[in-house]
Amino acid sequence: MSSQPLTAANIFAVLRHLRSLCHPTRPVTTASFASSIASQIIPSQAYNNYTSTHYTPLSIPKNGALKQLHFVASYSTAPPAKTEKVTAEDTSLSKSTKPKPKKPLPAWAVQKNALKEKFKEGWKPRKKVSPDTMESIRKLHSMDSVKFSTKNLAEEFKISPEAIRRILKSKWRATEAEEIDRRNRWEKRKIRIQEQMMELGLRHTDPTSKGDPSAEEVLSQRHYSSNSIEDLSGEYPSQNRRREGIPQKRIVPEDNSSRRFDPWEVTADDLLGTKRDYAGDNCAKEDSSKVRRSSTQRHPRRIEYNERSYKEKPDW
């Protein structure tokens, strides 16, 4: 086959033929494609010396339909079709833009959100509530839940309804040791507040000289009163039971075995209704009067009791 190179004169004819091949009306074969190109190529004198050994004709396998379509598409001048690529970000945005059904919030959640926007600290109240106050809140609510509702208790104690709701919901109770420690801490806080008030001139009493009982004394009194109430059946506690907490004075009998017996010793029983005028008795009376004077100065009520009869009771 002679050499028939492409020149500027016949390039438009080749391109026109390739464009017509993009939309063929009849099946295109390899032989017809090569013959059509060879018929439209005009030989040039400049390339006559080009031998046929250097020319390799274009060949497409007969059974390669996919390769033929790829060859036609590579020589076509039509612009390629644009394919829209959907990225992962677009899918995530499309999913997030879907409106979700909103559930109605409870009243406490609405109030919590409103407080968070206004005070930037949520429902947390500024006021500290003592453990005794919390216990009284629970007691009032258990007595009458309608009268002492969450709203009424919040208005009464000046705290938020959410705090009241959490206090009523909590079931934790402190042990006796924890309660003692808590009361001691509250006692220290009370003393600190009193000292601050004294510095400001709002209080004139000394907080250290407090007459309030300590936490241990309060708990012991509560324990004693609860036990006495449980034991009583409509009667007052016995005298011995009431004097359990009072320290009693131990009476130790005198040991008179070592003393010598004096037959002339006079007791108070011997002096009742008798009169003796001898000198020894007068001296003893003078000494006894001095002792009585000193004892009257110490114990004035004892003399009043001695002057009366033994059956009467004093007026103190």
Swiss-Prot record:
Pfam families recorded:
Neugrin (PF06413)
Q: Does the keyword Mitochondrion apply?
A: yes
Keyword Mitochondrion (UniProt): yes
Q: Where in the sequence is the signal peptide annotated?
A: none
Q: Where is the transit peptide?
A: 1-17
InterPro entries attached to this UniProt entry: NGRN/Rrg9
Gene Ontology CC annotations of this record = mitochondrion; nucleus
Task: Report biased composition (Basic residues) as residue ranges.
Answer: 291-301
> Which spans does this entry mark as compositional bias, Basic and acidic residues?
241-263, 272-290, 302-316
Q: Where is this region: Disordered?
A: 82-105, 198-316
Q: Which UniProt keywords apply?
A: Mitochondrion, Transit peptide
User: What does the UniProt entry say about where the protein is found?
Assistant: Mitochondrion
Chain's role:
Required for respiratory activity and maintenance and expression of the mitochondrial genome.
- PANTHER family in the record: NEUGRIN
Identify its protein family: Belongs to the RRG9 family.
Report the protein name in the record: Required for respiratory growth protein 9, mitochondrial
